[in-house]
Amino acid sequence: LELSKLLPKDLIVGLEIRPQAVAIVEERIKKAREDGQAKNACVLRCNVMKHFAHYFTKGQLDKMFFTFADPHFKRSNHRRRIINQTFLAYYAFALKVGGLCYTITDVKDLYDWQTRHLDAHPLFERVPESELKEDPCYIAIHNATDEAKKVDRNEGSKFAAVYRRIKDGTKKASATKASTVV
């Protein structure tokens, strides 16, 4: 709900597959609305991997957030990871040119997977860390989410990266050199 405070003129839509998580967020939104907050926030229960393309039109989104996604540790389940080459095409379609894709996790292997796939995609370029120091959304994903606070309590590490949606064909050749992404 922190994002609804940071971006009061934007609609904040959370998409989640787990019914329990949706119920918790719905309850928090309801409580926040009683206090006059979170009027621009909602959560929908859906399978993003099946239905994302049905929710958004081309260039509709300014920002996307992938916060503490399920790492699907088993190699046989890596295809279920929310960031992969196939779904990055959908995300690039919905994200406007110049829009930002924020990722954060406490699992180094997942971070490496996400950055490898985003680095390899022709429609995303990484935003340098120096540009993010004052970004309130970047700060919020590190400090304001329940999962981020849990990682802090457990003295864990957080790994974050932000990518900008770029115009077709504008990615530098050196950044798109041939590589195998698994």
PLM ranges: what are they?
Residues 49, 55-56, 60-82:
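A short SAM/SAH-binding and catalytic strip from SAM-dependent methyltransferases
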Residues 18:
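Conserved SAM/SAH-binding beta-strand->alpha-helix loop
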Residues 76-78, 100-121:
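Conserved class I S-adenosyl-L-methionine
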Residues 81-100:
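A short glycine-rich, Lys/Arg-flanked "PGG" loop and its adjoining helix->strand segment in the class I
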